């Protein structure tokens, strides 16, 4: 049990919230069921006492200040696409939704930055930047997450292999601290050596240290040419073993994804389209790499395609299929983008992990993971970012009793996380810890690092009101 005691929201406080955010305060059963859980419902449901739909930094600050003074838990909420229970108000209290803070505030093209409110959807920012001839490189699979949520988990996505993760594109932010104070961290400039980086501490903190309300993000000139390759293999081992060759030959893929045939077939059925071949010249396909390259000209990409084709065919690929039309490229990536959605649609009980391991350990790690499937009553499906070792592994069942499913999954996850740690990996590459992975984080990092994290949390949030029960602070 927590040593911190929280209070219930009173009618008087509700009236004050309504003064702060007129007609945007919901109470009790007025709050939609969607606000009780995120996309991974296996981590439980909890309804906040009050939901406030904020439209400005000042509103967020006023609500948080009132909650801090009265020791009321506060849970920040974006598009609720998380997978670890990070936006579930397990402590009750007040939930602050940031989805109405969805304005793109403007571009500074001379300094290649864009300023936005944190509730802007990733898809909206990507499309708007494209109209400006710019690219916002972070490209997580869930395009309808908020950018603030991406920052809160340091999401990576498909283009991380070349361009890095969300952290690499955050120049500055406006944050409401747990006390209700408003601070601006970072600056438009590209480098700094100015004391502790509170900006970087906030990135990946999952709403436990502050609520991000505005962001200044780095953008880059959009590449002039982009092309994708579908590369089929007879088996997953050969597929993954090819990955280091891309980097040894300086091919610099913009994205490099692996997918198992079963997962691809299920997704194509879900989407009602067939894109990926299942057999070529009598050879059954078992897995695929989906690679994208970008450059300044079509001629440059033609050279890259020729070299990449030689490399992968020599390494065991069955063939190389060029997605040489916009429609085929769109369809190929639509399948990749819908993998999780298809798994969710066909699964009653679902859990996941997104471990990250050194790239030279991917094949061995996935082979080990698949070997564990024989010991369980659930199915194991996987896909992920082959280029940086971030693997998405899902346990799926349609006929197990929930208690037994959770019991078996716990055994499976214990082994998976232990192996990832043994290989020099980490337990989460981009989905975060939330409250679903706290025990695994503690076991992976050990008591010294956890004690430091707890100390950081206490400095920012003395009353422990902000997103309690997540990362390092248990309820």
Curated annotation (Swiss-Prot):
This is D-lactate dehydrogenase. One of its GO terms (molecular function) is D-2-hydroxy-acid dehydrogenase activity. PANTHER family: GLYCOLATE OXIDASE SUBUNIT GLCD (PTHR42934:SF2). Residues 43-222 form the FAD-binding PCMH-type domain. InterPro entries: FAD-bd_oxidored_4_C, FAD-bd_PCMH, FAD-bd_PCMH-like_sf, FAD-bd_PCMH_sub2, FAD-linked_Oxase-like_C, FAD-linked_OxidoTrans_Type4, Oxid_FAD_bind_N, Vanillyl_alc_oxidase_C-sub2. Keywords: FAD, Flavoprotein, Oxidoreductase, Zinc. It catalyses: (R)-lactate + A = pyruvate + AH2. SUPFAM superfamilies: FAD-binding/transporter-associated domain-like, FAD-linked oxidases, C-terminal domain. It comes from Anaerostipes hadrus. The keyword Oxidoreductase applies.
């Amino acid at each position: 049990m927590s040593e911190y005691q929280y209070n219930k929201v009173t009618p008087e406080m509700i009236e004050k919230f309504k003064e702060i955010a007129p007609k945007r305060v919901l109470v009790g059963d007025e709050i939609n069921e969607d606000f009780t859980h995120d996309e991974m419902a296996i981590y439980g449901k909890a309804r906040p006492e009050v939901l406030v739909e904020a439209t400005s930094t000042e509103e967020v600050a006023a609500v948080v200040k009132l909650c801090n003074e009265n020791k009321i838990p506060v849970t920040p909420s974006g598009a609720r696409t998380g997978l670890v229970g990070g936006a579930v108000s397990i402590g009750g209290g007040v939930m602050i939704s940031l989805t109405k803070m969805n304005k793109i505030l403007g571009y500074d093209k001379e300094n290649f930055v864009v300023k936005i409110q944190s509730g802007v959807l990733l898809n909206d920012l990507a499309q708007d930047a494209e109209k400006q001839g710019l690219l916002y490189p972070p490209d997580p699979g869930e395009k309808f997450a908020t950018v603030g949520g991406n920052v809160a988990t340091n999401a990576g996505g498909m283009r991380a292999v070349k361009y890095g993760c969300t952290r690499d594109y955050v120049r500055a932010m406006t944050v409401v601290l747990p006390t209700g104070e408003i601070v601006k961290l970072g600056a438009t400039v590209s480098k700094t050596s100015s004391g502790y980086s509170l900006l970087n501490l906030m990135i990946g903190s999952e709403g436990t240290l502050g609520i991000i309300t505005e962001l200044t993000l780095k953008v880059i000139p959009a590449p002039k040419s982009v092309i994708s390759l579908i590369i089929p293999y007879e088996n997953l081992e050969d597929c993954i073993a090819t990955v280091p060759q891309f980097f040894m030959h300086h091919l610099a893929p913009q994205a490099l994804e692996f997918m198992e045939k079963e997962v691809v077939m299920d997704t194509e059925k879900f989407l009602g389209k067939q894109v990926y071949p299942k057999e070529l010249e009598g050879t059954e396909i078992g897995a695929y790499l989906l690679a994208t390259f970008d450059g300044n000209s079509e001629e440059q990409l033609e050279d890259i395609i020729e070299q990449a084709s030689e490399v992968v065919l020599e390494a065991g690929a069955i063939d190389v299929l060029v997605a040489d039309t916009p429609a085929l490229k769109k369809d190929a990536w639509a399948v990749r983008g819908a993998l999780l959605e298809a798994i969710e649609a066909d699964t009653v009980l679902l859990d996941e992990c997104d471990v990250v391991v050194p790239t030279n350990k991917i094949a061995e790690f996935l082979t080990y993971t698949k070997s564990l499937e024989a010991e369980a009553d659930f199915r194991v499906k996987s896909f992920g970012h082959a280029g940086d070792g971030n693997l998405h592994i899902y346990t799926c069942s349609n006929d197990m009793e929930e208690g037994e499913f959770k019991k078996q999954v716990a055994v499976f996850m214990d082994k998976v996380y232990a192996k990832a740690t043994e290989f020099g990996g980490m337990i989460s590459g981009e989905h975060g810890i939330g409250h679903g992975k706290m025990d695994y984080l503690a076991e992976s990092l050990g008591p010294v690092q956890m004690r430091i994290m707890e100390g950081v949390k206490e400095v920012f949030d003395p009353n422990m009101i902000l997103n309690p029960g997540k990362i390092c602070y248990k309820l």
